[in-house]
Amino acid sequence: AALLTASCTPALKVEVANTTPTERDDETVEIAWSEVAALKGVTPDNIVVLNDDNEQIPSQVLFRGGTEPQALIFQTDADPMESKRFKLVAGQRENYPAEAFGRTVPERYDDYAWENNKVAYRLYGPALETSPEKLVTPGIDVWVKCTDKLVIDEWYARGNYHHNYGDGMDCYKVGVTLGSGASLPFAGGKFWMMGHNYATAHTLDNGPIRTSVELTYAPFDVDGTPVTLTKIISLDANQRFNRMDNIYDC
């Protein structure tokens, strides 16, 4: 839980409370930009988050694919029942290292790949349908990593991600399965597979803390009804799990 209060100095005070009996590591704190904007003179280019020792910590302004700021995020640890205090001020943002990244990979049949400092994933794109492999699948592929660095660009450039060169590898075969975390509609007593890989991919935000993408799928048959799918995926630094919103429209 987060509480915002104003102070006499040009700053917003944020109190983050862990009200559970469980230690929380690298939890993402998200504050609506409408609340941040109450700080006079603040912009996405100068917003700074300070911890209780007055040290700047990495933060990211989310745009969610638009041109206007939507939210501010940063990460923190918290012991059970612990509260931590932060300040939001206008200042000089440091050059935070990117720990989350995603992009379309046209050089590999339009894969969409995304990662953080712990793990990488990919979905298969439209060009793969007409490749020699001719693969159509909603499945999500997982790349395991032995490094905290971002690897997508390097592994694709290397041309072989099925061998571990010391920084991890792709050791799973997705095929026509759901892979790691994909979903399908269930109707009329059966699952219904889409007829194509994703049609469009739009990166919404891209680090340093969160990468997110919106993917759309062409209409496919679900028990006699044409259905479209919009999939929104986000991955935060230091986490191994994605958030996925699957929006089916018929």
Regions found by a protein language model. Name each.
Residues 125, 215-219, 248:
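Short, structured patches in soluble enzyme cores that scaffold and shape functional sites
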Residues 87, 92-192:
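Solvent-exposed N-terminal domain segments of exported/luminal and surface proteins
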Residues 153-238:
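Extended, loop-rich substrate-binding clefts of extracytoplasmic carbohydrate-active enzymes
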Residues 1-13:
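Bacterial Sec-dependent signal peptides at the C-terminal "C-region" and cleavage site
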Residues 21-25, 66-68, 78-80, 106-108, ...:
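Solvent-exposed loop and beta-edge segments used for protein-protein assembly and interaction
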Residues 85-87, 214, 243-247:
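Residues within well-ordered beta-strands of beta-sheet-rich folds
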Residues 12-18, 118, 231, 242-248:
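Short, well-ordered beta-strand segments enriched in hydrophobic/aromatic residues
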Residues 10-102, 135:
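Alpha-mannosidase-like glycoside hydrolase catalytic domains involved in N-glycan trimming
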